[in-house]
Amino acid sequence: MTVTPERSKVLYFTPAYYYTPAAAAVHEDNTDITNLDTDLDGKRIGVCSACTYEFYLDRSLNIPGNYEFVVDNPQIQTYDTDSSAIQDLALGDGVRLDAAMSSLTTLQEAVDSGTPIKIVGAPLYYEPLAAAIDKKAPADPRPLLDEVSKTIKEMHKDGTLTELSNKWYGYDLTKKQGA
């Protein structure tokens, strides 16, 4: 789960185990959008509803790390899932969307499976993912939090998380980036 100040009011979080790179994609036929700092301004961008990608575009994103809001006045189109936005983008360049935002791994999976989209530019931000435990759990959640946190720290230290990331994604997403 993405760590946010709002969620931290009701949930305990472990140390981050993974940093999701947020990326943008366009239809494979698009030649106009090449610079994310300027070319997405005013464009129709599909994102999952109430996800960090929507919060990034409406400039309400509040997560740890350094990032800049570089898209001005986007026309945000929300979907139930990232996959639905990607499917609409795949219909054609500008048919329903000009671009879509999702995790780099989700977009890359779509590209690899033959979806007619392409990833544009570098990640816009990295969101930390951590295990979350309800602060109001019936039993004291802190011992569980401590054990899960300890395990995550050990997996970072011994390289297990890096090994899993490299195996499944082809690169290491376990280190804080863009900070």
Regions found by a protein language model. Give the residues of each.
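A ligand-binding cleft/hinge motif common to bilobed small-molecule-binding domains
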Residues: 1-10, 56-59, 90-126
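Hydrophobic residues within well-ordered alpha-helices
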Residues: 40, 89-93, 131, 148
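Periplasmic-binding protein-like
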Residues: 19-26, 52-58, 104, 108-179
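Ligand-binding cleft/hinge of the Venus flytrap
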Residues: 53-80, 111-112
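Short helix-initiation/N-cap motifs at beta->coil->alpha
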Residues: 31-33, 70-88, 127
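Acidic, polar ligand-binding/catalytic clefts
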Residues: 1-39
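Flexible hinge/capping segments at coil-to-helix
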Residues: 27-48, 60, 64-67, 139-140
